[in-house]
C-alpha cells in the first residue's frame, strides 16, 4: 500500500515553522490594534457567485485558479481565493457599514490552483486589512504606511514601494480603448495569453510575465495619459502624503494588480532580501466593490501580504542580520527546563513538579520515555533547554530535584521538590 501524501501545493505547517508564523501574527495583531483595526474571521467556503461578481469573470483567478464545486444542495461553492470579497460580504450581511466606517483585519488560508513554487502554494495564507468607508487620499497614505511600518517592524529590509493610479471607471475605459487600438496594430508581437486577453481583459496584459510582451509595452500608452484632472490631483495628494511621512516610492505606470475591483491607488511593496525584488504585500482602492456586491456605494481600500513569501524573506533577513528583528522572530524558542526522570516514585514526583513549574509561568518539557539518563540528556540538549531537572531513585528518596545548567557554566543545585518558589527563582536566574 502506497504511503499517503498531502495534495500537491497543500503544505503541512510543522511546529518549528509555526513558531515563527505565530510570532509574526502576534506582531501584526498588536500593530493593527494600535491602529484601530479589529479582527474579522470569515468562512473558507463561499458561494462561487461572490468571487465571480467581486473579482471579475475575466480574471485569471476566476477563469483558471478557483477551487469550485457543486455541493449536495446543488449550490455552487468555492474555497476563497482571496480575502477582500469575503470581508465585504460579511460587512454587508451583518450591517456593519450602518455603524460607520469599518477598519478590519484578517488572517487565514486562501486557495488557488497555481503552479506551486517557493513562497507560493495552492493553499496559501494571507494577513490583510480592509478599511471600508475610507474615501480621502489621506486614508490611502495611512493604509500604505500601515503595511510599510509592519514590514519594517518585522525586520524586512530592502523595501521598495511601487504605486500607480488606476483612476476612475471612466478613466480606465478611455485607456482601455486607447490600449486595445495600439495593441491591435501589433498582434503578431503579442504572446498567446495576451492575445486572448485583448478581447476580455486588456488591462491584464500590462501584468504579462512574457519578456517580449513587456518590452513591447514599454512603447505603449500609459494609464497616466488617460487620467482625468480630478484623478491626477488625487494621486498627487497620495504622493505628497507619502513624501511627508518619509516613505520612498517609485511610480510604476504598468502596475494594475490582478483583480478587477481596483481603482485609483494601487500599490505593491517588494523586498530584495531574496536577491531579486520579490513582492511581499499588495493592495489598493476598490470604491466600486461594495456596490457591486449589493451594498450602497462605499469607498474602501486594503492590502494583503502572503505569509509563505514573507517567511522566506524573514529567513533571508535573519541570515543577513543575526541580531536583527527578523532573527528574533525566526529563532526557535526553547523550554526553560527539561525534566529528566526515571523510576516509579521519581516519575510521579516529576509530574507534580512539572505541573507546578508550568503554573508558575515557566516552559517545561517532561521526558516521558523512561529511557536511560544518557538518552534523556541528549534530548534535553537537542531541544535547547537552559536547565535539566533530574529526578532519579536517589533524588526521589530525598524528595529533592537536581538542577543542572545546560546552556551556561555553573554548578548543579538541589532543592526540595516541594520548594517550587526556590526552583522557579533558580530557573529564572540569567
From Swiss-Prot:
Entries under Pfam families matching the protein: HGTP_anticodon, tRNA-synt_His
InterPro entries (alphabetical): aa-tRNA-synth_II, aa-tRNA-synth_II/BPL/LPL, Anticodon-bd, Anticodon-bd_dom_sf, His-tRNA-ligase, HisRS-like_core, HisRS/HisZ, HisRS_anticodon
UniProt keyword Cell wall biogenesis/degradation, yes or no: no
EC number(s) per entry: 6.1.1.21
Predominant subcellular localization, coarse grouping: cytoplasm
Catalytic activity, as annotated: tRNA(His) + L-histidine + ATP = L-histidyl-tRNA(His) + AMP + diphosphate + H(+)
GO (cellular component) term, any one: cytoplasm
Entry superkingdom: Bacteria
GO molecular function, one term: ATP binding
Keyword terms, alphabetized: Aminoacyl-tRNA synthetase, ATP-binding, Cytoplasm, Ligase, Nucleotide-binding, Protein biosynthesis
Listed Gene3D superfamilies: Anticodon-binding domain, Bira Bifunctional Protein, Domain 2
Gene Ontology process terms (BP): histidyl-tRNA aminoacylation
Localization in the cell: Cytoplasm
Self-association and partners: Homodimer.
PANTHER family, sorted: HISTIDINE--TRNA LIGASE, MITOCHONDRIAL-RELATED, HISTIDYL-TRNA SYNTHETASE
UniProt family annotation: Belongs to the class-II aminoacyl-tRNA synthetase family.
Official protein name in the record: Histidine--tRNA ligase
Source organism of the structure: Parasynechococcus marenigrum (strain WH8102)
Name of the gene encoding the protein in the UniProt record: hisS
